[in-house]
Amino acid sequence: MQGSMRLWLSVLTFTLSLLICLGTLADAYPSKPDNPGEDAPAEDMAKYYSALRHYINLITRQRYGKRSNPETMVSDVWWRESTENIPRSRFEDPSMW
């Protein structure tokens, strides 16, 4: 009886934490601006196009992660297992001379 109660309590806790995590992820993404309609005044259309431009810039911007960090690139070069994959400078290439 007590084992069954613990199982249901852990399932309930996991489900609630999963729902909270999914809710925060859904709020993090920007929402598309509402279209004011075809017969809207020029000021509303200008605001809509400005908001739409901002929305498009947000969702299409480039995102840079840890791989572009110079410190991680140096550590990858130092701790790599084989030396075959290390990029060579173009001056080491015999065809350049």
Curated annotation (Swiss-Prot):
One of its GO terms (molecular function) is neuropeptide hormone activity. CDD domains: PAH. Residues 1-28 form the signal peptide. It is found in: Secreted. GO terms for biological process: feeding behavior; neuropeptide signaling pathway. Expressed throughout the brain with highest levels of expression in medial pallium, basal forebrain, preoptic area, midbrain tegmentum and trigeminal nucleus. Keywords: Amidation, Cleavage on pair of basic residues, Neuropeptide, Secreted, Signal. The modification Tyrosine amide is found at residue 64. GO terms for cellular component: extracellular space. It comes from the Eukaryota. Its main location: secreted. NPY is implicated in the control of feeding and in secretion of gonadotrophin-release hormone. This is Pro-neuropeptide Y.
